[in-house]
Each structure stands twice: as C-alpha cells, then as structure tokens.
UniProtKB/Swiss-Prot annotation:
Reactions catalysed: a quinone + sn-glycerol 3-phosphate = dihydroxyacetone phosphate + a quinol
Pfam families the record matches: FAD_binding_2
Organism, as annotated: Mannheimia succiniciproducens (strain KCTC 0769BP / MBEL55E)
Protein name: Anaerobic glycerol-3-phosphate dehydrogenase subunit B
Record-linked HAMAP family: Glycerol3P_GlpB (MF_00753)
GO biological process, one term: glycerol catabolic process
Amino acid sequence: MNFDVVIIGAGIAGLTCGLTLQEKGVRCAIINNGQAALDFSSGSMDLLSRLPNGSTVDSFAQSYAALAQQSPNHPYVILGKDVVLDKIQQFETLAKSLNLSLVGSSDKNHKRVTALGGLRGTWLSPNSVPTVSLEGKFPHDNIVLLGIEGYHDFQPQLLADNLKQNPQFAHCEITTNFLHIPELDHLRQNSREFRSVNIAQVLEYKLSFNNLVDEIKQAVGNAKAAFLPACFGLDDQSFFESLKQATGIELYELPTLPPSLLGIRQHRQLRHRFEKLGGVMFNGDRALRSEFEGNKVARIFTQLHLENAVTAKYFVLASGGFFSNGLVSEFEEIYEPLFRSDIVKTERFNATDRFSWISKRFADPQPYQSAGVVINAECQVQKDGNNVENLFAIGAVIGGYNGIELGCGSGVAVTTALKVADNIIAKESSN
C-alpha cells in the first residue's frame, strides 16, 4: 500500500495535518489506534496560558520573547514567532470552515469556566461553554446550575461553591437544581453506564424532547441562564442549540469527567472532514516497526499488516505522548518506539537518567512531561544526531515543553501540524 503521506496518529494534530493535505490533493492515510486524547479534553484549545516562571499569559505575541528566553527548546521557539502566528491564524480560519463553533482569538486569551467552578485561561472555546474576558464579568446575574439525578460526573453544588469565589461571578445569584429526565431511568440502574456518552445516545432521538424542554424551564424558574453538564448532542451542537431555542433560556454546557462530549464532537467533525476529502483511515491499527533506506524512512509495518508494508513519500509522527504510547518509559530510559528518534535533553531532564524524570514535590511540574522527540524548524525528526529527510513530528510527541504546565498542548499540535502540511505541499508543488 503506497500513499503520498502516512500519518501515525489520529488526534487533533494528525487529523489537522491530514485534512489540510487532502484539501490540496495530497493522498494521505492515517493509522488510528483508537481513542485520542481529544476524546477526553474539555473542548477548549490552549495556545499559551503560562510561562515557565509561572507568569500568566494574556497575549501570546506579547509573551513570546519571554517564552523564548525561558524555554529555548519549546516548539514555538524552534518554529519562530512569525511562523507560529501565521499557523494560528490559519487554524482559526480552518476551524470556521469546519463549523467547530469556537470563540476566542490569538490576540488575547479568555477564561472558561471549568466543571469544578474555576476559571482557566485559554485560546479557543466552544461557543456553548461559559466564558468571560480577562477583565470582564459574566453577562448574567442570575444563574441556575442544573445537574442530572444520579449522574455523579457533574456536581452542581460543588460548582456553585467554587464559582462564587471568582470576582467575575461575584455579582451573580447562583442556585442549583436537578433534572430527572425519565428517559434515563434504565441507565441509573448501573452507574457505570450512566456517563455523558450514554446519556447523549439515549436523548439524541428526541423521543421526549418537549418533556425535556418543559423540565428545564421548570427547573430554571425565573433565572436567565443555566449551566448543564455536556450530555446533550453526540455528533455536534445541533441538539443543544435546539434546546436553547425551545426553552428561550441562555443555556451553557460544561465538560464532565471523561469521556467528554465537547472533545468527541471535535474529533468526529475533523475525522468526518478528512474522510470526506478522500483520506484513508487504518482504524484499530497500530504502527509496530519501521525500515530505513539511507536517511529516509522507506516503509512501516502495522499490527494488521505485518507482511504487507505501508510505504509513502513522507511520514508524519503524530502518535502523542505517554497517554497514547507515542512515548514509552522503561526503567532505564524514555524512548519513541517506532523510529527510535532522538529524545530532547534539557538542563532538568535526561531520558537516560531516571532521577531527572521527576520532581520531589508531587505538585510541581514534572520534568518527564517535557520528554519527546527532537525536531528542527521544519519539524523534521532527528535520529542519531541527523535530521531524517522524509520524517516529521507534530503534536505531543515533540519534546522540549510541558503542555500541562504551560497550557499550550493544543496550540503546539495545530501549529506544527499546519507547518508540516505546508512543507509537504510545497515539496509536492515543486516536483
């Protein structure tokens, strides 16, 4: 099986790169080993929320110089400010064309409400999620937080107690209530099945839609806004938008414990677009080994194609970090298993020195979280000290940064994905 590009990994980085290439007529295949981290995400995308010294970031452009000084191995610094800003704008345009229904701008971060009632700085958020500007107040002063009876992944009272502590909500009267929704009674018999995805699947056929509308109206009372767990609408926001229109209430949804519908919706929309453009998905498959010819990757073999090699002009490593086995740790080393790429080494972290992997304080940023492969400004992967000509890395498999600590995981994913896509398109156009 031969393609122009083979992408290993079907998360936000792999799908963004793949559909961008397919739009330009470059034949792509994505090897998809199952659920991606996107399925467990809040649906919001971070560009850069904090600097390594702990300072809060309001504007990416204004904070870039400080990032470059404090974290010279960060992928943003390797790519360069102008490239990153260009790819950010490119993704914002792409998100609109995909109808991802995101709000926000790279000019300035905003704050989103978390399921525990905190406020977290971010770049883009689903327009159904409650957000506030960095200095602003929430636009409604009377809010009801609605839980679902028997659903333990969303606790409205805990949310209310924490939300009141934020200055942006100090002017609000916040109350709580619960929806019963009789359609869900059979799920309540087994708490393991009473999850957001199961709830959405039961409700999506709208068999008792009017009853649900009436129950929400009654539970909200005279309030102008209500927060609900994100359990309404599996494929997109159309079900939730129908609820808003039918109730006449400003409804907002908050991410729940994983799996998260907000992330699942985005994953499905990206994947649907990729396949609609003619992209090939190797679902339930896993890349196991690779073969090189000179300074190029010649072929890879997968779990379902052990005898028949998968070949391509270019290979893109989008396999993620430890969560998705894009990186593996053993007692003596951390390594990238498919190509055995070089791993980033910093002052605080060495992949072959186990004592450098962790901080003594549990709550501190952990050095191992900055593990990943070495890239250059073109996102080419380094192996044995040399850049591999036709192998690129994108997303969480790249090293030199801690996406959790800095709040930049999604931004790194989409900027590197678009950078690699543009590189390959340019190479194909010149041939």
